[in-house]
Amino acid sequence: MTKKLHIKTWGCQMNEYDSSKMADLLDATHGYQLTDVAEEADVLLLNTCSIREKAQEKVFHQLGRWKLLKEKNPDLIIGVGGCVASQEGEHIRQRAHYVDIIFGPQTLHRLPEMINSVRGDRSPVVDISFPEIEKFDRLPEPRAEGPTAFVSIMEGCNKYCTYCVVPYTRGEEVSRPSDDILFEIAQLAAQGVREVNLLGQNVNAWRGENYDGSTGSFADLLRLVAAIDGIDRIRFTTSHPIEFTDDIIEVYRDTPELVSFLHLPVQSGSDRILNLMGRTHTALEYKAIIRKLRAARPDIQISSDFIVGFPGETTEDFEKTMKLIADVNFDMSYSFIFSARPGTPAADMVDDVPEEEKKQRLYILQERINQQAMAWSRRMLGTTQRILVEGTSRKSIMELSGRTENNRVVNFEGTPDMIGKFVDVEITDVYPNSLRGKVVRTEDEMGLRVAETPESVIARTRKENDLGVGYYQP
């Protein structure tokens, strides 16, 4: 009888990536098949996020539901991973003694051994250590699930912003070697992936070892990824302004595979609040980066993160944020009301902005961003946009759907053979959350570069070390 695995994931794209790796790993080692139905599962894993307010209580609320399933099936294994697990550790078992496994983001590769241990002597396992980059060496080869894929290139963050738990839950910055990253992407390209999204908590801080022992920069890595045949689009998430250097901006000037869309969090437009946040840059320095980016890539669109109601934020501070939003003309944002994360310096600050004032500021900010986003969308009306077709439209099974370079969802009539390929679409209608268009050119008519198949890249560049472990050498 097939054993089943259910994973519930909260939080960022890195968590989504980690969950997909957990599924691949446990399929390879134990034959577990994913199920969306928790009641069917032999193993339940909760991959948690500590960014949002009351994250811990949300975890225990979910575990309370799963406790009922364990009472019916004592052999059921329950595991808690992610940032809340890293933060809370053994405390989770003190409140929820029926949890069998607690693991951090850096120890998910040890899940097979943890499950074996629990199956053997029923002893609970807690492992929230930071074994640096070890997990990537233990994960199975990647499996593509459509024409787009996420690839983690680094872990952790050294910035220690006063409101953020990431350095405490995922550790400090550790970069994967460039050959590991390039080999993974080449494998994905061989399976039909056309767009890759490079992931890291502070992705542009990547400083990985090259095959010759030298240290590569993020700009170097972007150009190497762009050179992999089959990869026609590159995105990356999430960046920090302090390390958005001129060499990265130059890649936007000469590398068309890098999309004309960037998510670059700023958090506030007030230098005083940025200083309290520990951001180590000013609003003017942020705008200087955007100005240089638009000189290199005039059509680039920018999204950002904002925190409103940070301790000490005055009306004047908030007005400076709104001015920055207008000056940069952000296309979209992820914006939140400040809520203290336990263990961070900001948790010790006086939270002196009234809750109603926070809500009002958030509403004003989001309304302005929505207006700007709609204006950007209207400018696309009548233009021809290149779409990577991802599959059937959510709006109608008779239509297809894909994304533009600037991350707009476009629905259109097409044929099944277009899925996984590029099409050029003329935009005919604009809606708040999507666009509509008609196909004017298929991929066969585009003359896209196909100089070498991804399979031949792998065959030509695959090397093995003394242990028989494959690696990539340009």
UniProtKB/Swiss-Prot annotation:
Q: Which PROSITE patterns match?
A: MTTASE_N, MTTASE_RADICAL, RADICAL_SAM, TRAM
Q: Name one GO molecular function term.
A: 4 iron, 4 sulfur cluster binding
Concerning InterPro entries, the annotation shows: Elp3/MiaA/NifB-like_rSAM, Methylthiotransferase, Methylthiotransferase_CS, Methylthiotransferase_N, Methylthiotransferase_N_sf, MiaB_methiolase, rSAM, rSAM_horseshoe
Q: Extract the SMART domains matched here.
A: Elp3
Cofactor(s) needed for function: [4Fe-4S] cluster
Instruction: Relay the cofactor remark from the entry.
Output: Binds 2 [4Fe-4S] clusters. One cluster is coordinated with 3 cysteines and an exchangeable S-adenosyl-L-methionine.
Query: Where, per UniProt, does this protein localize?
Result: Cytoplasm
What sort of enzyme, by top EC class, is this? transferase
Q: Which UniProt keywords apply?
A: 4Fe-4S, Cytoplasm, Iron, Iron-sulfur, Metal-binding, S-adenosyl-L-methionine, Transferase, tRNA processing
Provide the TRAM domain boundaries. Answer: 378-441
Q: Provide the function of this protein.
A: Catalyzes the methylthiolation of N6-(dimethylallyl)adenosine (i(6)A), leading to the formation of 2-methylthio-N6-(dimethylallyl)adenosine (ms(2)i(6)A) at position 37 in tRNAs that read codons beginning with uridine.
Its assembly, as annotated, is: Monomer.
* Protein name, per record: tRNA-2-methylthio-N(6)-dimethylallyladenosine synthase
Q: Tell me the organism.
A: Shigella sonnei (strain Ss046)
